[in-house]
Design a protein with these regions (language model features):
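Conserved kinase catalytic-core helix
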Residues: 168-212, 291
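Juxta-kinase regulatory segment immediately upstream of eukaryotic protein kinase catalytic domains
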Residues: 2-77
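ATP/Mg2+ or Mg2+-diphosphate-binding catalytic cores
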Residues: 5, 259, 398-454
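ATP-binding glycine-rich loop module of kinase domains
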Residues: 90-125
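Short beta-strand micro-motifs within the conserved protein kinase catalytic domain, predominantly
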Residues: 146-155
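ATP-binding glycine-rich phosphate-binding loop
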Residues: 72-99
Length: 454
């Protein structure tokens, strides 16, 4: 069932379900060309399979009746990604007639692999991107791709191709400039990154678009306790336990053995969670899943205090997802909203301060912390002073980031990066606490433990 998005984007006309069928032979030939041209790099999967050919044919046939396509002939198919979560293709079409010159020359079609992605809002996936793009474009119009169409049965989205109109060559991302550009080009690119996050932070979380986003996730996923909070929060806690050598099944110590119920008694033989890990787990959850992200409705007063340091964004802070546009067009665009969430504004700041350790080319990104990152802090926090409370929040954001990467990288080819990530994470935590004069013993001790490499 193809879903018209006309109500969300008034300029769009209803989908044309009576469009003539596409040329199957032409599509098959273009699919073969796309597969032959695609060279996946791990963890991307091979596209050379029967199932992939079937999926691509299904995607192209579905997109044919979109109003933005208007049954035009496909000229080229390019496979952009075959990751664990989704398959992404760019489809270029024959130019529109003069009467329809506003139609796009290409679109992005994205299919999500997980069968539960249309009912599970806990991680990155269909629901967060489908409803997230609507919310993000209401918060900051034009920053993210337009959503052209959605089909929950196929788990497919059709999106604006924001690379159309960027500088010549491949997509000119901030990451590309940080890797390949001159010192000045890298500095300029970081300024683009900052300008992308400035309006997102300024929009805050009090608007109707944010609450509607959370309501949409709550309706789609009846089991979501914190709809719209940061995706996959358990990663950081598992990484924390790994750091302290604690088993995953470790339990909190019982305050009163006589008051244990039957369910807790079943786990009485499980190892006890050390006090430091229990306290840090609580601190992690306080930042990742603040009270105001519980299932709506939530009284507005709960957002007035802590909510001031939260924002809605794509939830992926990689410089790869910030594109620098052509000189005569939009100067900066962002892509990939699979993880759209309400999160503490400290997370993009910490990512940049650590040199973007969550991104594929870390540690090769050239990040001038002294010149560029004070401006990022100002853009995110509107020149608020780094007081004790904010510094401790940022230290927790640092701890969460490092622990999540410990869980993700420890059994992968990137495990060799962890000593550096731990060391620099500990240094950043100490710096933040020192600048603000914080006496938080829990965070100080954690920083020491984090930096104590064996």
């Amino acid at each position: 069932m193809q879903v018209s998005l006309s109500s969300n984007f008034p300029a769009l006309s209803p989908n044309d379900s009576s469009a003539p069928a596409p040329d199957g032979e032409l599509l098959s030939a273009l699919i073969e060309e796309a597969i032959a041209a695609y060279s996946p790099v791990p963890p991307q999967a091979s596209a050379d399979s029967v199932s992939m050919r079937q999926n691509l044919m299904q995607l192209l046939s579905w997109a044919h009746s979109l109003e933005q396509v208007a049954a035009r002939t496909v000229e080229r198919v390019q496979i952009l990604g075959t990751g664990m979560r989704s398959v992404v293709v760019c489809v270029a079409y024959k130019p529109a007639a003069e009467s329809a010159e506003s139609l796009p020359t290409s679109i992005i079609v994205k299919r999500y692999r997980r069968k539960d992605s249309t009912v599970n809002a806990g991680g990155f996936g269909y629901l967060r991107e489908r409803y997230g793009l609507e919310a993000l474009n209401l918060q900051v119009p034009g920053l993210f791709p337009q959503l052209y169409g959605a089909d929950p049965e196929l788990r497919v989205l059709a999106l604006e191709d924001v690379s159309a109109g960027t500088v010549e060559g491949e997509q000119y991302s901030v990451a590309h400039a940080l890797l390949e550009g001159t010192e000045q080009q890298a500095l300029d690119a970081l300024n683009y990154y900052i300008e992308a996050y400035r309006p997102l932070a300024a929009s805050g979380i009090m608007g109707e678009a944010v609450e509607e986003y959370r309501l949409n996730l709550a309706r789609a996923d009846r089991k979501a306790h914190f709809p719209g909070a940061i995706a996959s929060p358990g990663l950081a806690e598992r990484g924390l336990k790994k750091l302290y050598g604690v088993a995953d099944e470790a339990r909190s110590p019982e305050p009163d053995a006589d008051s244990m119920d039957s369910s807790s008694a079943e786990h009485e033989d499980a190892p006890v969670l050390p006090a430091a890990v229990e306290e840090l787990s609580f601190r992690f959850r306080r930042v990742l899943q603040p009270f105001f992200t519980k299932r709506p409705p939530v009284p507005e007063q709960f957002k007035l205090n802590r909510g001031k340091v939260y924002m809605l964004s794509s939830g992926d802070f990689s410089p790869q997802n910030v594109l620098i546009g052509s000189a005569d067009g939009t100067q900066v665009r962002m892509v990939d909203a699979e993880g759209t969430c309400l999160h503490h504004r400290g997370f993009p700041f910490v990512e940049a301060m650590l040199g973007f350790p969550s991104s594929p080319e870390y540690p090769r990104y050239r990040v001038d912390r002294m010149k560029a990152l004070p401006a990022l802090y100002s853009a995110l926090f509107e020149d608020a002073p780094l007081d004790e409370h904010l510094a401790e929040d940022l230290a927790v954001c640092t701890a969460v980031t490092v622990c999540a990467l410990l869980e993700l990288y420890s059994s992968s080819a990137r495990s060799g990066l962890l000593p550096r990530i731990r060391r620099e994470g500990a240094q950043l935590m100490r710096l933040l606490l020192e600048i603000a004069g914080s006496q938080d013993a829990t965070l100080a001790e954690f920083a020491d433990h984090l930096g104590a490499l064996k």
